[in-house]
Each structure stands twice: as structure tokens, then as C-alpha cells.
Amino acid sequence: MKIFGRVVSGFGEGKYFVGLIPYKNKFKELTGFTPYEGTLNIKLKTYFDIDKYDPLEFDGFEIDGKEYFGGKVLLVTLFNKSGKFVDCAIVSPKKTDHSKKTLEIIAPVNLRKFLSLKNLDIVKIIQALK
């Protein structure tokens, strides 16, 4: 798998959700890293079907009567235009306000800062080796 997309602003909700302890612990278990509290959003030209790539699944949970949904994670490597990269993961929640053309990426670092990314920058994503 090799796809290209553009960095876009999200809704600002990634920080909240990734910061929830059950999600943070599950992401660490599935990816091997503690995620930075936030996501990088990548807009694609076409629909992305995560199920084609054998993703890892995670269950939802409940906190104080509020339900939080599960989803899927796919280990990938994200490259900036200079070739600098970070091993990270696509997160595909069962419930999202994003279109199927927008990927949410989690990583152990702030990807915008570490890779010097700004809105509309083009990035390359490849599936990580298992």
C-alpha cells in the first residue's frame, strides 16, 4: 500500500479522544507506542477502505454511562516531502464525523511539529511491515 494525501485541519476532537485512558492504553497495546494526544488528518482523493489491509480491531468502552465506540487501527509509516518519516497508525473509529476520504493518524509525536507539516502539504503513507 502506498497512498498520498494532503494535511488538513480536523475538528479538534482527536486530542480529547486519544487522551482518554482506555483509548490511550489500547492504542499503546496495538501499536507499541504511547500516542501523542491528538491526530493528524489527511485528505485523500478517493475513499480509503481500511479493511483491505488487515487492520487490528479494538472494542469500545463506557465511562460514567457514556459509550465510546471501538474501531480499527492500521500500522503505517508517514513521510513528509523531504523523506523524513515516522512510524504511526491510521485510526478508523466506528463512529466519526470525518468522510471516508479523511484519515486520522496517531503517532508517538506531534506529527505537524516533528515533520514540519502545514495544511495542504502532501504526505506519503505506506503500510508498515508486521
From Swiss-Prot:
Its pathway, per UniProt, is:
Cofactor biosynthesis; FMN biosynthesis; FMN from riboflavin (CTP route): step 1/1
User: At which positions is Mg(2+) bound?
Assistant: T39, N41
Q: Which UniProt keywords apply?
A: Flavoprotein, FMN, Kinase, Magnesium, Metal-binding, Nucleotide-binding, Transferase
Enumerate the cofactors the protein uses.
Mg(2+)
Q: What is its EC number?
A: 2.7.1.161
- Binding-site positions, CDP: G10, F11, G12, E13, G14, K15, V109, N110, L111, R112
Name of the featured protein: Riboflavin kinase
Q: Which organism is it from?
A: Methanococcus vannielii (strain ATCC 35089 / DSM 1224 / JCM 13029 / OCM 148 / SB)
Gene of this entry: ribK
